[in-house]
Amino acid sequence: EELSAYYLYTVDTRDTIPNAWSKRLPSLDVAKIPLASYYKFEKEVWGDQVMRFYRFTNSVPSKLGKEPLPDGAVQAFRLAGKDESLDYVGGTSVKYIPINEHVELDLGPDREVQVRPVLMNWIKKDLAFESDGHVKGWTTVETWEVEVQNCREIPVTVDVRRNQPGD
């Protein structure tokens, strides 16, 4: 419910909370929200870790989008095992999320997905010389092999980014 520049959020459950206690109550039925799960690897940003992300849109077709989502902590869990107990996937904090905004949640590193870039070969070519014979520039050509290892039970999408130094 919108109230000037503020929103009131209704929690769909009832609970008794003793005086001087606090309790977290679920505010979304997340099982209905379409999420895209994917991974990113960028050595210059995260080192050798592969980071896991969830992506969704705060929109009505995504079962959200009736109002902006407030600042707060988001923790992701998955159902695990035969008893379907909750298994912690990761968490992050979010800022105010407007209606129709695309959201990317950084859930942290995932040890079950590994990326190993290996420099296989390199050469210098196109050498340029100054008038006195000193080298003033060249082109370096590198050949890389990137091994991606997925130890999860499901297929994953990994965005591998390689930053090349240059001038």
Descriptions of predicted regions:
Residues 1-167:
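Long, intrinsically disordered, low-complexity accessory segments associated with secretion
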